[in-house]
Amino acid sequence: MPDLEVRRLGRTEMRPKALGLGGGHLGDPERTDEEAVTAIRGAIDMGINFIDTSPYYGVSEPRVGLALSGGWREKVYLQTKVGSHPRYLRDFSKEATTWSLENSFKQLKTDYVDSVSIHGPRYDIDAPLGACLDVLVDWKAKGRIGHIAIGVRQQEFHRRAIETGEIDIVLTFFDYTLLSQSIAETTIPLALENDVGIILGSPLAASLLAGPEPEFQGAIEDVSNSDGTLTPSAVGGPTDPDAIPYAHRMWEWCEDRGLNIRDLAMQFVLNAPVEGNGIVLTGSANLRQFEEVYASATTDVPEAVWQDFESEFGIRI
């Protein structure tokens, strides 16, 4: 069973483990603070040292702050986001960005965050790379944040952000999984060329590759542009009309051979061509879920399995 290696996250010189903990599910109000704290501290005890959260994720930030109190903060790299607080959703103005940062620091009970990500601009990258980025650059210069990231799926936005010279990390999701490798020849080489760290989110494609049989949900909402192409946020994810059938084929293939699709999914993303300059970010609602993902991330998949998988699906590590 391989251990998780330490990675270099681009020019940030942060040294996180190859797998980080995402806080999206930790903010579920249907779950307790105790569950979230147990999950976070349990992951840290397993060696995880990169935690991502956002004001968009319900009560994730205060729960992360609670979990990292009492000396736990010093054990991890911490990343949160701007542009996604419900009070100022997709408001990338100076005022909204400053308010969001101050609020996040209060919720997280910290005076320093290792990375802050510009979160989810949809149709326009100019505003996020204007006043919002100016605020982050100022806070970085003052030593309140360590690095600046952008979390978005559009590859053109990745390029524009990297070209500013101010973006240290690119976070994307659904874009390098067993179902889609859309950034393999675009964002990944561009980030490596500019020594920008890479975070690959949603390695299990929003649970389509988590182990249980992928469910067909029937009619899927219209996720197409006027020209018939999929919106960027849909490709490779659970609202992509092709994703569930494709995931189901892979799941059946694994079931027929006594394999867990989650093992292949995690090993595939951990072996993305980031040349040691990126990590994988997975979200878990509780410690048991994280332990399952961690087990898959540290499980050897035999070479013969990958050869057969490649023959069927055309991809392998």
Q: What does each of the following model-derived ranges do?
A:
Residues M1-V76:
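N-terminal binding-site loop/beta-alpha segment at the start of enzyme catalytic domains
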Residues L9, L21, A36, I51, ...:
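Conserved, mostly hydrophobic/aromatic
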Residues G22-E34, V82-T98, I125:
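Active-site mouth loops of central-metabolism enzymes
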Residues G24-L26, S54-Y56, K81-H85, I118-P121, ...:
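Active-site beta-loop-alpha junctions enriched in small/polar residues
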Residues E74, E163-L171, L192-I198, V274-G278:
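Glycine-enriched alpha-helix->loop->beta-strand junction motifs that scaffold or abut catalytic
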Residues Y88-Y176, S182:
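Glycine/proline-rich, positively charged
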Residues T164, P203, P214, I220-D300:
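Conserved short secondary-structure transition element at the edge of the structured enzyme core
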Residues S182-V223:
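Aromatic-lined glycan-binding groove of carbohydrate-active enzymes
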